[in-house]
From Swiss-Prot:
Task of the protein: Component of the KaiBC clock protein complex, which constitutes the main circadian regulator in cyanobacteria; it may modify the ATPase activity of KaiC. May be a metamorphic protein which reversibly switches between an inactive tetrameric fold and a rare, thioredoxin-like monomeric fold (KaiB(fs)). KaiB(fs) binds phospho-KaiC, and perhaps clock output effectors.
SMART domains found in the cross-reference section: KaiB
Organism encoding this protein: Prochlorococcus marinus (strain SARG / CCMP1375 / SS120)
Source species taxonomy: Bacteria, Bacillati, Cyanobacteriota, Cyanophyceae, Synechococcales
Database matches in PANTHER family: CIRCADIAN CLOCK PROTEIN KAIB2, KAIB-LIKE PROTEIN 1
Protein name: Circadian clock oscillator protein KaiB
Quaternary context: May undergo a major conformational rearrangment; in the free state forms homooligomers. When bound to KaiC switches to a monomeric thioredoxin-fold (KaiB(fs)). The active oscillator complex is probably KaiC(6):KaiB(6).
Domain of life: Bacteria
Length: 117
């Protein structure tokens, strides 16, 4: 079994707004449940550190960025939906085994010929 990856995440918030606090609460629950011991989270308040937001091109809050492992992924806005957060950061699919992913028929849900006549 290979060692688990380490995840580096940055959460950009604007003060202690309800959206910011909800994002932080949801994210901590996800990390403690699914990524315990293999993550580092940096919370950046863009009101206190506007230069960091500018450097990282953050235009809206809350924004969650997965820095490592590559590729960098961002999810902006409501972070209260656990599954949406995991899918948006491309973390959910890493947990699935190959047999889980390919359990359906090749022509089932994901057809590359969709929309062709």
């Amino acid at each position: 079994m290979s060692p688990r990856k380490t995840y580096i995440l940055k959460l950009y918030v604007a003060g202690n707004t309800p959206n910011s606090m909800r994002a932080l609460t949801t994210l901590r629950e996800i990390l403690q449940t699914d990524f315990k011991g293999v993550y580092a989270l940096k919370v950046i308040d863009v009101l206190k550190n506007p230069q960091l937001a500018e450097e990282d091109k953050i235009l809206a809050t809350p924004t969650l960025a997965k820095i490592l492992p590559p590729p960098v992924r961002r999810i902006i806005g409501d972070l209260s939906d656990r599954e949406r957060v995991l899918i948006g950061l491309d973390l959910l699919f890493e947990e699935l085994s190959e047999s889980d992913f390919f359990s359906g028929s090749p022509d089932s849900e994901f057809s590359s010929d969709e929309g062709k006549s």
